[in-house]
C-alpha cells in the first residue's frame, strides 16, 4: 500500500486554509445570543421562531444519524446541499485550474463535467462500453486515462445515471489500488439503495483515496430538502468543510431529514425500495414486448434507459398521456433513448398504455 496521503492530493494553497469561521461555529455558551446579528424577534410566518437563527453548519443529530445509516464515523461525513455541493467541493479542493484533470464516463450525470468546467479543470472522457450486459464502465481504461492525464479526480457513478449499470466492488477496489497516492476515486451512490452491489463505503478503512457520495433525494424521497453526504477520509472531510459555505443545511431540512432516518421511517423507505425494485422488473419485462422498443437496458437504479425506433414519437405519446419522462436524445450516443423513472404501479401502467396505443395507431 502506498505511503502517500490523500492530503498530498489537495491543492497546495488550501492545505493550511482556515476558511470562514461563522458565529455558529464558536463553542461559546449563553442564554442571550447577540453574536450573529440575527433578529431578536421571530417572523409572523414563523410562529415558533424556529428559523430566526442561523443553523448549525453540520447538525449533530443528523450527522450522527447519517453516519449510522451509511456505516461510517461522523468525522468521515460531510453534509451538503445535495451531492452537487459535494462534487463542487471536491473539484475546487483538489484541482488546480488548467492543470489537474477530472475523469468522467459519459453518458453520465452532467454535474461532474459542469463543476470541472467552472474550475477550468481539464475533462477526460472515457465513454461507457455498450455491450450485451448494458452500458458499463471500462475500469482498466478509466484507470489508464487517469494515469495518463495525471488526473486528481475520477468519478464513478454506480449505479450509473442514466445507464443504470453498477460497478462490481472488486473493480472499484482495483481502481483505488492503482490510483492510490495519485487520484481520488469518487463513487457516486445516489441510487445505491436500489442496487444489488454493496456500497464502496466499506473500502474506506483501507483506501484513503476513496470518496463516496450518498443522498436522501432518491430512495428517501426528500429531493427538495437537498441533503447529500460526502463520505471520505476524515482529514479530507475537515479540509472540505473549511471550503464549504457557512450554513449549508437549513434547520427545517435538517429536522425533516433526521425524522426520515428514524426506525419507523426507514422501515417505510425499505418497503418502498422493495416495491420499486419489483416494479422495475415488471416494467422492464413489459417494455421489451412493446413494438417500437429497440432495447431496454438492465438497471440497478430506480429508472430504465430505453431505446426506441422513434424516440420522438414515443416521447410525444407519453407527453400526450400526461407522462413526463427524461428525453436523452441530445446526449451523445443516446439519440434514440428516453429515461423512465419507476413510478407507482398505476403510473407505470400509464407508461405502457401510452406506448401501446401509439403503436396501435401507427
Curated annotation (Swiss-Prot):
Keywords: Amino-acid biosynthesis, Aminotransferase, Histidine biosynthesis, Pyridoxal phosphate, Transferase. The keyword Transmembrane helix does not apply. CDD domains: AAT_like (cd00609). GO terms for biological process: L-histidine biosynthetic process. Its cofactor is pyridoxal 5'-phosphate. SUPFAM superfamilies: PLP-dependent transferases. It comes from the Bacteria. The modification N6-(pyridoxal phosphate)lysine is found at residue 218. InterPro entries: Aminotransferase_I/II_large, HisP_aminotrans, PyrdxlP-dep_Trfase, PyrdxlP-dep_Trfase_major, PyrdxlP-dep_Trfase_small. It comes from Xanthomonas campestris pv. campestris (strain ATCC 33913 / DSM 3586 / NCPPB 528 / LMG 568 / P 25). Pathway: Amino-acid biosynthesis; L-histidine biosynthesis; L-histidine from 5-phospho-alpha-D-ribose 1-diphosphate: step 7/9. This is Histidinol-phosphate aminotransferase. The keyword Lyase does not apply. GO terms for molecular function: histidinol-phosphate transaminase activity; pyridoxal phosphate binding. It catalyses: L-histidinol phosphate + 2-oxoglutarate = 3-(imidazol-4-yl)-2-oxopropyl phosphate + L-glutamate. Belongs to the class-II pyridoxal-phosphate-dependent aminotransferase family. Histidinol-phosphate aminotransferase subfamily. It holds the Pfam family Aminotran_1_2. Homodimer. Its EC number is 2.6.1.9.
Amino acid at each position: 500500500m502506498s505511503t502517500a496521503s490523500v492530503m498530498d492530493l489537495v491543492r497546495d494553497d488550501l492545505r493550511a486554509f482556515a476558511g470562514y469561521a461563522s458565529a455558529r461555529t464558536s463553542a461559546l455558551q449563553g442564554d442571550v445570543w447577540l453574536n450573529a446579528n440575527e433578529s431578536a424577534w421571530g417572523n409572523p410566518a414563523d410562529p415558533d421562531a424556529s428559523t430566526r437563527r442561523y443553523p448549525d453548519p453540520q447538525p449533530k443529530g443528523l450527522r450522527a444519524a447519517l453516519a449510522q445509516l451509511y456505516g461510517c464515523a461522523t468525522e468521515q461525513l460531510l453534509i451538503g446541499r445535495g451531492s452537487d455541493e459535494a462534487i463542487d467541493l471536491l473539484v475546487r479542493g483538489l484541482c488546480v485550474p488548467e492543470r489537474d484533470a477530472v475523469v468522467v464516463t459519459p453518458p453520465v450525470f452532467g454535474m461532474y463535467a459542469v463543476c470541472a468546467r467552472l474550475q477550468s479543470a481539464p475533462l477526460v472522457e472515457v465513454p461507457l462500453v455498450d455491450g450485451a450486459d448494458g452500458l458499463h464502465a471500462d475500469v482498466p481504461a478509466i484507470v489508464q486515462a487517469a494515469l495518463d492525464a495525471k488526473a486528481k479526480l475520477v468519478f464513478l457513478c454506480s449505479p450509473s445515471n442514466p445507464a443504470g449499470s453498477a460497478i462490481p466492488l472488486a473493480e472499484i477496489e482495483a481502481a483505488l489500488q492503482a490510483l492510490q497516492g495519485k487520484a481520488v476515486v469518487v463513487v457516486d451512490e445516489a441510487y445505491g439503495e436500489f442496487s444489488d452491489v454493496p456500497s464502496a463505503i466499506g473500502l474506506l478503512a483501507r483506501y484513503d483515496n476513496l470518496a463516496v457520495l450518498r443522498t436522501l433525494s432518491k430512495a428517501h424521497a426528500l429531493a427538495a430538502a437537498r441533503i447529500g453526504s460526502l463520505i471520505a477520509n476524515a482529514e479530507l472531510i475537515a479540509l472540505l468543510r473549511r471550503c464549504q459555505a457557512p450554513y449549508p443545511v437549513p434547520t427545517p431540512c435538517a429536522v425533516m431529514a433526521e425524522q426520515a432516518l428514524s426506525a419507523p421511517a426507514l422501515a417505510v423507505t425499505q418497503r418502498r425500495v422493495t416495491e420499486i425494485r419489483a416494479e422495475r422488473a415488471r416494467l422492464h419485462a413489459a417494455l421489451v414486448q412493446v413494438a417500437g422498443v429497440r432495447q431496454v437496458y438492465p438497471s440497478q437504479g430506480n429508472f430504465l434507459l430505453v431505446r426506441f425506433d422513434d424516440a420522438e414519437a414515443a416521447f410525444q405519446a407519453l407527453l400526450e398521456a400526461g407522462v413526463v419522462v427524461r428525453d436523452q436524445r441530445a446526449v451523445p450516443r443516446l439519440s434514440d433513448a428516453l429515461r423512465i423513472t419507476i413510478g407507482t404501479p398505476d403510473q407505470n401502467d400509464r407508461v405502457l398504455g401510452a406506448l401501446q396505443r401509439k403503436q396501435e395507431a401507427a
